[in-house]
């Protein structure tokens, strides 16, 4: 490639792309980040859907870069954001594995303890896991009194397990009409194995969350000042956005997230529709954040009065709930962009009353 004009090289954002981007930037080249959805669309337009090879992918990326040079974000392979993304990805994998294990535990408990939902709402909490570990089936509870069980569970539950809870456990187990199943010892071993895996993943999750919180503080981010945004949500957003300097304005960030509406028009008439392009992980995170912000508390008060008022305003204009949430997502993008760009904290605007203009 010649070093003409702005010296632009094209790359995929995953796999070996980061190492290549680092090398090219060190050489003084401008590197653009091409989303896989954009290169896939380019491949469809040139009729190459059924010719899948490395050379076809490279051509699609090159054409996408040439056609959308000014719209694509600059690649910024910052080590801090890259490491943050690795941690977020690891946490997501742990949560997926944990969900799979919880479902497997449900299958075992349905047979061993038919009434288990009466005494443990969340079967994967530390107290519940301790119980399944020491009492994988009802036969291990023989001879156990309420006092004995409470003395055992109180330290594990940090004094939250009451005598009433222990009575509920023993009464529910006694009322179950369950006959002695053959080969219960084999199923008990399965339960113990699942519990051990859950405890292992919980330990890993704790360590990952600690590191994520440390990195969040190290980056000096202020996103947690937004109501409804905790550290985990904030680091998910940061991991996908990376260095905010690669986006010249909020519109570029909205396009990157796939939240900017796509305008379709013909014969002077047109409409805005939701785009299927962009960073899906960032798009989903922002969308679910918008859902949390418009929700009402148990007392009926809005969690974020400003966002709720904007949501009701859009609904009154004839927009559907989904369209209103997309509008909120777009506003959140602008807020997040400004906070990351200037390092400012979120300030709750004042909701104007109906009589105010």
Where is each model-derived feature located?
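Single conserved hydrophobic/aromatic residue that forms the stacking wall/gate
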Residues: 1-9
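Acidic, metal-coordinating catalytic cores used for nucleic-acid/nucleotide bond scission
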Residues: 10-20, 270, 274
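Short alpha-helix plus adjacent loop in nuclease-associated cores
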Residues: 32-73, 133, 137, 269-277
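A short, charged helix-loop
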Residues: 62-86, 173-178
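Glycine-rich, often acidic, oxyanion-interacting loops/wings at catalytic, nucleic-acid
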Residues: 92-219
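Phosphate-backbone recognition surface of nucleic-acid-processing proteins
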Residues: 222-225, 231-317, 321, 356-357
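Basic, amphipathic alpha-helical segments enriched in Lys/Arg and hydrophobic/aromatic residues
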Residues: 315-357
């Amino acid at each position: 490639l010649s070093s003409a004009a702005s010296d632009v090289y094209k790359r995929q954002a995953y796999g070996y792309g980061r190492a290549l981007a680092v090398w090219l930037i060190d050489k003084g080249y401008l590197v653009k980040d091409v989303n896989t959805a954009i290169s896939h669309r380019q491949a469809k337009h040139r009729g190459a859907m059924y010719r899948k090879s490395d050379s076809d992918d490279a051509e699609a990326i090159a054409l996408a870069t040439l056609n959308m040079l000014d719209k694509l974000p600059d690649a910024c392979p910052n080590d801090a954001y890259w490491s943050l993304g690795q941690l977020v990805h690891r946490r997501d994998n742990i949560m997926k594995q944990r969900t799979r294990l919880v479902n497997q535990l449900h299958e075992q408990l349905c047979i061993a303890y038919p009434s288990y939902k009466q005494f443990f709402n969340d079967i994967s909490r530390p107290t519940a896991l301790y119980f399944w570990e020491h009492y994988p089936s009802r036969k291990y509870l023989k001879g156990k009194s309420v006092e004995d069980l409470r003395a055992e569970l109180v330290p594990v539950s940090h004094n939250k397990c009451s005598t009433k809870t222990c009575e509920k456990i023993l009464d529910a187990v006694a009322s179950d009409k369950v006959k002695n199943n053959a080969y219960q010892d084999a199923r008990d071993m399965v339960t113990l194995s699942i519990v051990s895996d859950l405890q292992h993943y919980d330990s890993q999750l704790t360590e990952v969350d600690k590191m994520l919180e440390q990195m969040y503080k190290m980056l000096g981010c202020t996103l947690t000042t937004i109501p409804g945004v905790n550290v985990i949500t904030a680091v998910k957003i940061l991991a996908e956005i990376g260095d905010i300097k690669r986006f010249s304005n909020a519109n570029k960030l909205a396009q990157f997230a796939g939240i900017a509406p796509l305008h379709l028009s013909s014969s002077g008439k047109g409409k805005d529709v939701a785009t299927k392009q962009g960073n899906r992980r960032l798009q989903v995170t922002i969308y679910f954040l918008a859902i949390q912000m418009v929700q009402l508390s148990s007392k009926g008060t809005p969690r974020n009065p400003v966002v709720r008022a904007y949501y009701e305003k859009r609904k009154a204009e004839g927009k559907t709930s989904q369209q209103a949430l997309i509008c909120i997502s777009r506003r959140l993008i602008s807020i997040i962009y400004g906070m990351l760009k200037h390092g400012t904290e979120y300030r709750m605007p004042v909701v104007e009353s109906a009589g105010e203009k």
